[in-house]
A protein has these predicted regions:
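Glycine-rich His-Gly loop
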Residues: 33-37, 109, 162
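Short alpha-helix in the alpha/beta-hydrolase fold that links the catalytic acid
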Residues: 46, 143-146, 155, 169-177
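Short beta-strand/loop motif that positions the catalytic acidic residue
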Residues: 153-154, 159-161, 165
Length: 216
């Protein structure tokens, strides 16, 4: 069970909209969390991750991507992906202005994909990435890989993937991750589908991995 040890406040400045989780005892680290294509920053998984991070002293901004700010429902359009990454850049800059230490980017599905693409374009935008349920390919279309940017990704990446995720098998993800020149690790969530349920991710192990990378 996660105990609430943070002050949670709505944030809406500079085109960034979401919620700030402010820990009682800040570690100096910051994190931006973003949602998948069919969700928003109120997704239970993001709220749980934000609270888990706050228990470790991490200041968290879970935010709506620009496509979700424009409309409450519906998937993102491919033509708007660059704008979504620009929104992520602004969110990272916002959290960086609030903390003295490293900043992590984390996202579920589409949010994770855009986070990784932004890190490939701007290596200094984050100290490490947590990509949850990375959408390696559309379901039943394993040849339509979303990995063009992987060879440019030098930021450490933690993939958190369910073993029943139809967007990527463990074998497919392992093969794809080999193209990433930076440090990477796959953390499996046994029995979980693409929409990983609450309480299934080993938060302590996940954040320990991110911290291990920045300490090395």
């Amino acid at each position: 069970m996660l105990w609430f040890v943070a002050q949670i406040t709505e944030f809406n400045e500079g085109g960034v909209h979401g919620f700030l989780h402010l820990p009682d005892e800040p570690s100096g680290e910051g994190m931006v969390l973003t949602h998948g294509a069919g969700s928003n920053c109120a997704a239970p998984l993001l709220v749980e991750l934000a609270q888990a991070a706050c228990m470790l002293g991490i200041t968290v901004l879970r935010c709506d991507l620009p496509f979700r700010q424009r409309r409450a429902y519906g998937p993102p359009m491919p033509a708007g992906a660059a704008a979504d990454r620009a929104g992520l850049h602004n969110a990272a800059a916002t959290i960086r202005s609030m903390v003295r230490g490293p900043v992590f980017l984390g996202g579920h599905s589409y949010g994770g994909r855009q986070s990784s693409m932004l890190a490939a374009e701007e290596p200094g935008v984050a100290a490490a990435l947590m990509l949850i349920s990375y959408p390696l390919h559309p379901p039943a279309k394993p040849l339509e890989l979303r990995t063009e940017h992987f060879p440019a990704l030098r930021t450490p990446v933690l993939f958190v993937q369910g073993t029943r995720d139809k967007f990527a098998t463990h074998a497919e993800l392992t093969e794809a991750v080999a193209a990433i020149p930076g440090p990477s690790r796959i953390m499996l969530v046994e029995g979980a589908p693409h929409e990983i349920g609450r309480g299934l991710i080993d938060h302590a192990a996940a954040f320990a991995q991110l911290r291990q990378w920045i300490a090395s």
